[in-house]
Amino acid sequence: MASQRNVRNVLEVGANRVLRPLGYELRDKVLSERPEGFPGYLEAATQSGMDVNDFEEQRLGWRLPRPTLDEIVFPYLREDSVVCEIGPGTGRWSRHVVDRVPGGELHLVDASPWMVRFLRTYFRERPNVTAHLSNGQSLPFERRAWLDLIFSANTFVELKLGVIHLYVEDFARALKPGGYAVIDYIDPTTDEGWQHLLTQGAEMAPVYTFHTPQIIDRVFQDAGLRVERRYQVGKSTFVIARHD
């Protein structure tokens, strides 16, 4: 136990030396705020002199957002659209979305206090971007019928059906008539989804969830959203649903 504490302390000292000038510190409190691996990515990016989102794409090999956004998000946006993104991480997708709504608003929602603080700092020069802390199963807004589009990538792939149901009910409340919800899940009836199930390994088995298209359709339809189409990107099946 003592050796584990010593290792942890050494890691914290090194990380804090890099993160403190940026307004962050790596402590047990930070780790309890569910930032996943992002503090480490930020530290490594800072040491490399890179933007953290560029680091995630260029060094970690994460999928580039633009081709997917071009297909399933940008066609539904106007310059003055009001958009909500759930689970934005460090803003890899968000930084492209905000450029498409110069006269609109982008609301970023995350359940991690660390992520929310980071996003507020990262987008501090973008006055039309606001980061909000959520409870991880609903939108932190009381307003009705005010969003043009709700978007999420790589978040709902980890959510249980009950939580997805709660979110979709919130989508119906918050979206304007004619607004869209675009989220991804893992569909085990697709070749890509099934292969992910077979190859994810023991460590990731507790992380991802798998839902059939019939179940996802029913969740959206019961909430008053009509599924218009799907789009496959790797393991993810994006569903595009309209609030009539």
Where are these regions (language model features)?
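A short SAM/SAH-binding and catalytic strip from SAM-dependent methyltransferases
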Residues: 149-162
